Amino acid sequence: WNEISDDLGQRFEISFNTYKPFACGIVIHPSIDACVQLRKMHQLQAADIAKVTIRVHSLVLELTGKKTPATGLESKFSVYHSCAVGLLYGQAGEHEYTDEVVNRPEVTALRARVEAIVDDRIDEAAVDLTIRTTDGRDLHLVVEHAIGSLERPMSDAQLRAKFVG
C-alpha cells in the first residue's frame, strides 16, 4: 500500500510524458532515430545501402514485426517499414505512414533489405544498428535513448517543425 501513497502530492506522472517525434509505435523510435542519424552523417541514399541490420529487444518484433505491411495503418506497426522510410526520407511522420508510401517500389525494396535480430542485451528503449553499404563499409550506431524520450527530449525547433511544419 505504501506504493500508492509514497510521494503523494510530490510526484506527478504527467511530468514523465514526452512528445513522440515519429508517427508509429514507441518501441520503433530508437531504430528510426538511428537510421535518420546515419543517413545524415553519411549522406546515404537508398542505392548506397546493401543491408540494414538492427539488433533489438524482443518487444520490438513482438509489437512491430510486420515485414510486409499493405496499408498505412499496418506500417505503423512495422519496424521494417519505419527503418526504410527513415533512411529514404530522413523522417517518419504521418505522411510516411500512408497507403501510398507503403507501396512505393523504393520503400518496399529498401524494407526487404532490413533484418531485425532479437538481442537480449538490448534494452527496449535502445537499438544497435549496422548498415552495410554497397561499397562494403559497415556503418554502426547504438542509440540508447531515442529522440523524444525523457533522456533526449525534442527541442523547441523540433517541436515547431513537427506541429507547424
Short names for language-model regions:
Residues W1-G165:
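Terminal-appendage/accessory-domain detector
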